[in-house]
Amino acid sequence: MMDVNSSGRPDLYGHLRSLILPEVGRRLQDLSPDGGAHSVVSSWMPHLLSGFPEVTASPAPTWDAPPDNVSGCGEQINYGRVEKVVIGSILTLITLLTIAGNCLVVISVCFVKKLRQPSNYLIVSLALADLSVAVAVMPFVSVTDLIGGKWIFGHFFCNVFIAMDVMCCTASIMTLCVISIDRYLGITRPLTYPVRQNGKCMAKMILSVWLLSASITLPPLFGWAQNVNDDKVCLISQDFGYTIYSTAVAFYIPMSVMLFMYYQIYKAARKSAAKHKFSGFPRVQPESVISLNGVVKLQKEVEECANLSRLLKHERKNISIFKREQKAATTLGIIVGAFTVCWLPFFLLSTARPFICGTSCSCIPLWVERTCLWLGYANSLINPFIYAFFNRDLRTTYRSLLQCQYRNINRKLSAAGMHEALKLAERPERSEFVLQNCDHCGKKGHDT
């Protein structure tokens, strides 16, 4: 049987020594029967041994146990002090800004009278979902990332953390979907939908969103698909069926609905833009010019002025509808675009991971997973600022709250609303021209 050295490898050189050296000694004894062979062997032995390289014991490679910086399911990263400071500062800033922005939304809608409208209840639900992500999820992910990806909060809290993460993020995404439907119905059914858009209807929609979000959270807690959880890793279940179900309900279906709603609003805005074209003043009929009686001629002119006045009123109404549709299309387009950019990479990765890595762990590089995850969390940061940018009342309320001017908020909003109404009431130049002509015609008719 071949010898094995201390490193666990076959000792080839030792085996050769055991075969060659006795044979050399026996031949030397045959050549020197007078007993001088022993001295010859002794003198030549060091030279014979020197022809074979010395084998030193080396530690056997550890094939079963990974090194300290790698876990059995996913890698870990050892950051330097500077890297920890930079990463920690960025993650802390994202978390604090998310908390501040969504708190402003909740405070604004709840405490400002003008903003307490049923249509804004969905925005409050969205802000609460994003605020929950910032308070209950982001801090633990930040700590895990700063220590290199190792989960240190225990087995039980791993399940609680995953449940909170999935439910809050899903509620945020599905609320965005419901908001897009609400905006679409408000644009396409301006007469019937506002009547149904009361507080009770909004409460039912919000409750449905959170219950559906919980339906994705509960299966791993009741044994359908177990989360991946050991001493170092906390990962949502990688079961194939659960992965397809959760990603479809939480992202792919809401994204499809949002894209469809945006397309419908965009199409309505294009259709309204095609209709919104001033057709010009109607031509004066020959009988109104060539008339046997001047009174009949003036009467024709007065009727034409009245028709033009009604036409311009209808045009101003079309302008208002057109602007509202354009604003809704722009706002929803930016919301859908930001949502897709933030969450699409994460859900593509989450869907493909079980089919690439199997159901027991993740083989995706840690920095790729964390980058996609925090990109999705960033959607909770930008939502309040998107709505504030396109909503004048929210923007004014934000400014007043940040300046600690709490008592004057309702007064400022009322003044701003009055100013906006006066701007809309101003007539364009063509309207003034027609009214002046109508007044002139009326005076001439009265004089006649």
Curated annotation (Swiss-Prot):
Predominant place of localization: membrane
Compartments, as annotated in UniProt: Cell membrane
Lipidated residue numbers (S-palmitoyl cysteine): 404
Keywords of this entry: Cell membrane, Disulfide bond, G-protein coupled receptor, Glycoprotein, Lipoprotein, Membrane, Palmitate, Receptor, Transducer, Transmembrane, Transmembrane helix
Topological domains annotated Extracellular: 1-86, 144-155, 223-240, 356-366
Would you list which residues are glycosylated?
A: 5, 69
Q: Which residues lie on this side of the membrane: Cytoplasmic?
A: 112-121, 182-201, 264-329, 391-448
Here the disulfide bonds are 158-234
> Where do transmembrane segments lie in this chain?
87-111, 122-143, 156-181, 202-222, 241-263, 330-355, 367-390
What membrane topology term does the record carry?
Answer: Multi-pass membrane protein
Superkingdom as given in the UniProt entry: Eukaryota
Give GO terms for biological process.
Answer: adenylate cyclase-activating serotonin receptor signaling pathway; chemical synaptic transmission; circadian rhythm; smooth muscle contraction; vasoconstriction
Q: GO terms for CC?
A: plasma membrane; synapse
Supply one GO molecular-function term. G protein-coupled serotonin receptor activity
Q: Which residues bind serotonin?
A: 165
Q: What does this protein do?
A: G-protein coupled receptor for 5-hydroxytryptamine (serotonin), a biogenic hormone that functions as a neurotransmitter, a hormone and a mitogen. Ligand binding causes a conformation change that triggers signaling via guanine nucleotide-binding proteins (G proteins) and modulates the activity of downstream effectors. HTR7 is coupled to G(s) G alpha proteins and mediates activation of adenylate cyclase activity.
Q: Which family does it belong to?
A: Belongs to the G-protein coupled receptor 1 family.
Tell what the record comments on domains.
Specificity for G(s) G alpha proteins is determined by the length of transmembrane regions 5 and 6 (TM5 and TM6).
Protein name (database record) = 5-hydroxytryptamine receptor 7
What organism does the record attribute this protein to? Answer: Mus musculus (Mouse)
Q: Which gene encodes it?
A: Htr7
